[in-house]
UniProtKB/Swiss-Prot annotation:
Biological role: Specifically methylates the pseudouridine at position 1915 (m3Psi1915) in 23S rRNA.
CDD domains: RlmH-like
Protein name, per record: Ribosomal RNA large subunit methyltransferase H
Entry GO CC: cytoplasm
Record-listed S-adenosyl-L-methionine binding positions: L73, G104, L123, S124, P125, L126, T127, L128
Keywords, ordered alphabetically: Cytoplasm, Methyltransferase, rRNA processing, S-adenosyl-L-methionine, Transferase
MF annotations from Gene Ontology: rRNA (pseudouridine-N3-)-methyltransferase activity
Amino acid sequence: MKLQLIAVGTKMPKWVEEGYKEYSRRFPKDMPLELIEIPAGKRGKNADIARILQKEGEAMLATVAKGNRIVTLDIPGKRWDTGQLAQQLDSWKLDGRDVSILIGGPEGLSPACKAAAEQSWSLSPLTLPHPLVRVVMAESLYRAWSVTANHPYHRE
């Protein structure tokens, strides 16, 4: 199973790239973590946010391979602790499909992305900066994998 993070935004600060790479490189070859960046729509004083969300959503969904499970990252989604995320990871593996996790831009995800999702995950009730979310996601998914693999990274 392959895990994809499909995220709005490019040209992240160096610390974000390094943090993400640190965790993504740790994944086993049979479960790689891939990051796909979608350029953010131009936002200005009089920007049409609904149109920007629509275009970003179309671009995100266009990168999802047919048959992939789509999971959105959204504040009203379901919150999982590490054990529950590990159970989700096991469930996704048994499903036999690759998983695409959609991370929206500053205004979130388009209605089309939300409608296409089989699951919605809330990372936190806090509002987090989108660059930081990439690092937190990579670490959380790696930690969940370590639980499923009985790897010593995670300690109770």
